[in-house]
């Protein structure tokens, strides 16, 4: 599997397929709205400076849950678009329509898809406990350190401020250590289950669906020996992800269809290799 050729094919398809942008219109709009409605960095800094670690943990949990809900809704539309692309690549449909972005909400797909996504995310959450705990500690201590530094007159730190920063630095180191360990543990699992949504679609069409856990097991089997390939595909999009961040999501008009077209092509090529 050549990832460079895969990405080049995805870019070519973006130019050649009419209606591709329309297929991803809803998730792009949701992403833009969520970016504009999110908390500012200044507000977060002031809040973290006035609370203890327990309160910061509750805030991060609530923000994380809100983010998960938004991501879940976005994922339903993106999965719908991906299913339409699968049919297009297999010549089971001739053109894309806006209604294809709602495929996941059909009676046949919605319940199995929600169950599969729920099981997948629950399993990944369990694998990511260290990552979540480390993230909360790192974010909390980082904002505390920044707040202390910004409150210093003319950026001249007093001995007390230096001591406070030193104490928080130890917590920051612990948080970053937990994040690193969490990533080492959770990333292989994330990629092991990365093909579950596509496998579910094929099982539903073939009449072989036997429940979400069977879908997840099939994804683990399919990804044996290819988790590194999928990881490198994601790494190749880091520059595009940074561009999306810098443009508050506006670059997603191009980037989101590009990334997910590549993901569908990856699945199609992987499925062919595994036959």
Predicted feature residues:
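Hydrophobic alpha-helical membrane segments
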Residues: 1-275
């Amino acid at each position: 599997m050549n990832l460079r050729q895969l990405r080049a094919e995805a870019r070519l398809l973006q130019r050649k397929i009419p209606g591709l942008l329309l297929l991803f219109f809803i998730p792009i709009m949701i992403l833009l709205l969520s970016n504009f409605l999110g908390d500012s960095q200044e507000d977060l800094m002031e809040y973290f400076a006035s609370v203890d670690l327990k309160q910061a943990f509750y805030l991060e949990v609530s923000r994380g849950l809100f983010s998960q809900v938004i991501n879940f809704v976005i994922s339903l539309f993106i999965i719908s678009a991906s299913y339409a692309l699968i049919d297009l690549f297999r010549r089971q449909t001739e053109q894309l329509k806006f209604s294809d972005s709602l495929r996941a909400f059909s009676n046949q797909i919605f319940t199995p898809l929600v169950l599969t996504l729920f099981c997948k995310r629950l399993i990944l959450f369990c694998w990511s406990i260290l990552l979540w705990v480390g993230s909360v500690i790192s974010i909390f201590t980082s904002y505390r350190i920044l707040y202390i530094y910004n409150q210093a007159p003319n950026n001249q730190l007093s001995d007390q401020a230096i001591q406070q920063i030193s104490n928080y630095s130890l917590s920051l180191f612990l948080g970053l250590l937990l994040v690193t360990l969490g990533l080492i543990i959770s990333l292989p699992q994330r990629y092991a289950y990365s093909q579950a949504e596509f496998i579910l679609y094929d099982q539903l069409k073939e009449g072989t669906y036997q429940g979400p856990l069977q879908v997840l097991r099939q994804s683990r089997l399919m990804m044996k020996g290819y988790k590194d390939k999928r990881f490198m595909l994601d790494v190749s999009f880091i520059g595009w992800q940074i561009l999306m961040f810098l443009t508050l999501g506006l670059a997603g008009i191009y980037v989101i269809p590009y990334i997910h077209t590549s993901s569908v092509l990856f699945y199609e090529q992987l499925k062919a290799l595994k036959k």
